[in-house]
Amino acid sequence: VDPAQVSGSWRTAAIASD
């Protein structure tokens, strides 16, 4: 798993959850 992809996924989830 690409760390960058994971980071982006978490960021998207955080933004959507915000």
Curated annotation (Swiss-Prot):
Function comment: Binds the chemical odorant, 2-isobutyl-3-methoxypyrazine.
GO biological process, alphabetically ordered: sensory perception of smell
Organism: Oryctolagus cuniculus
Keywords assigned by UniProt, alphabetized: Olfaction, Sensory transduction, Transport
Family recorded in the similarity comment: Belongs to the calycin superfamily. Lipocalin family.
Subunit annotation: Monomer.
Full protein name: Odorant-binding protein 2
Superkingdom of origin: Eukaryota
PROSITE patterns in the cross-refs: LIPOCALIN
